[in-house]
């Protein structure tokens, strides 16, 4: 018998079975089309405040291990799947997905038609939703959802609270934590970088005081226009140091240079998004997770030029500065999870640092 339901703000109800924590949560309902990588999705801070629908029909079949987390504490509001595996099989598996969600206090629902839900989100756009007990009155929950205002301080919720010690030797890279994935740190350290992680609200003066050879701006959740402190910091360093922005970092650099952003109807979330480098003609398959994009037309009045576009919807996927060693991409070159087609961009960042140090 059904014991949990997903109720959307428009009154649509999906009845299913509970797994994970026995709690009720409200969030923005989104979908991800990746076939694997549910542990990385679960722990990606960019999903802060969201209820994530996984379109692949069977989730959890290789369990949860200690190595594949992208943050210390997952912050999604819920997980929606067609079928959840209760008996995972993998030599690294330490617990089931159900057990992991219970440990982190995250509710889940399975047994619903995730294809129907995804088609609805694709055609109507993402909406607020709530995972609740089957006993809850639908009209009451819908009324609560309509009154609910989703938080605007999402980057603050997931960013580091203080400056971290260095994690390596070599080129000094200040990593501005907007909701970073551990995979980004891993890529930098593997290239011999001395990585210093700083909070999102670190000032330009504080960043420059660390004497960085380069600055990287990470991924993160929410509306980029809410991150005003980060935008001001970027304005203060953009002509003084080599910069590489990823995802949220890409959007903030664009805003700092005078471009505009807008909310996508249903976002880009998955591990199979084709992106074209319009400078070289190269097409890469990328991992993506974002609900906002940079307005291409707004680049005309800035010192930025378009470098990458999405094949599927022709939206902006990358820019570079015309005067300074600054470039950004909307997708995730560190993958985790996803294809590694664009990991070479970390090498481009290192090359820019070296050229700027000469």
UniProtKB/Swiss-Prot annotation:
SMART domains: CPSase_sm_chain. Disulfide bonds: none annotated. It catalyses: hydrogencarbonate + L-glutamine + 2 ATP + H2O = carbamoyl phosphate + L-glutamate + 2 ADP + phosphate + 2 H(+). Pathway: Amino-acid biosynthesis; L-arginine biosynthesis; carbamoyl phosphate from bicarbonate: step 1/1; Pyrimidine metabolism; UMP biosynthesis via de novo pathway; (S)-dihydroorotate from bicarbonate: step 1/3. Residues 172-358 form the Glutamine amidotransferase type-1 domain. Pfam families: CPSase_sm_chain, GATase. L-glutamine binds at residues 46, 220, 222, 248, 251, 289, 291-292. It comes from the Bacteria. PROSITE patterns: GATASE_TYPE_1. Its EC number is 6.3.5.5. Residues 1-168, 1-171 are annotated as: CPSase. GO terms for cellular component: carbamoyl-phosphate synthase complex; cytoplasm. Belongs to the CarA family. This is Carbamoyl phosphate synthase small chain. It comes from Fusobacterium nucleatum subsp. nucleatum (strain ATCC 25586 / DSM 15643 / BCRC 10681 / CIP 101130 / JCM 8532 / KCTC 2640 / LMG 13131 / VPI 4355). The gene is carA.
């Amino acid at each position: 018998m059904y014991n949990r339901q997903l109720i959307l703000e428009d009154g649509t109800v999906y009845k299913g079975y509970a797994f994970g924590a026995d709690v009720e949560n409200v969030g923005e309902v989104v979908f991800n089309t990746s076939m694997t990588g549910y542990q990385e999705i679960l722990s990606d801070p960019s999903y802060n405040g969201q209820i994530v629908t996984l379109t692949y029909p069977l989730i959890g079949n290789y369990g949860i291990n200690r190595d594949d987390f992208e943050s210390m504490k997952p912050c999604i509001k819920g997980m929606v799947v067609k079928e959840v595996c209760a008996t995972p099989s993998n030599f690294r598996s330490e617990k089931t997905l159900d057990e992991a969600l219970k440990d982190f206090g995250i509710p889940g629902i399975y047994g619903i038609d995730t294809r129907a839900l995804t088609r609805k989100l694709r055609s109507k756009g993402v909406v607020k939703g709530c995972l609740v007990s089957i006993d809850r009155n639908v009209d009451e929950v819908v009324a609560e959802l309509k009154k609910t205002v989703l938080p605007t301080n999402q980057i603050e919720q997931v960013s580091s609270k203080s400056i971290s010690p260095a994690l390596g030797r070599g080129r000094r890279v200040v990593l501005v934590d907007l909701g970073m994935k551990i995979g980004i740190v891993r890529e930098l350290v593997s290239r011999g970088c001395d990585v210093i992680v700083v909070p999102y609200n670190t000032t330009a003066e504080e960043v420059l005081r660390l004497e960085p050879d380069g600055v990287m701006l990470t991924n993160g959740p929410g509306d980029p226009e809410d991150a005003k402190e980060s935008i001001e910091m970027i304005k203060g360093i953009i002509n003084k140091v080599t910069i590489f922005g990823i995802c949220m970092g890409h959007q903030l650099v664009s805003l700092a240079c005078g471009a505009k952003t807008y909310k996508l109807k249903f976002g880009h979330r998955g591990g199979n998004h084709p992106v074209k480098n319009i400078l070289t003609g190269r097409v890469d398959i990328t991992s993506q997770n974002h609900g906002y994009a940079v307005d291409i037309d707004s680049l005309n009045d800035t010192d930025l030029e378009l470098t990458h576009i999405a094949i599927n919807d022709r939206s902006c996927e990358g820019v570079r500065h015309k005067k300074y060693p600054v470039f950004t991409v909307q997708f995730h070159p560190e993958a985790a999870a996803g294809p590694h087609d664009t990991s070479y961009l970390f090498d481009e960042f290192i090359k820019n640092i070296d050229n700027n140090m000469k």
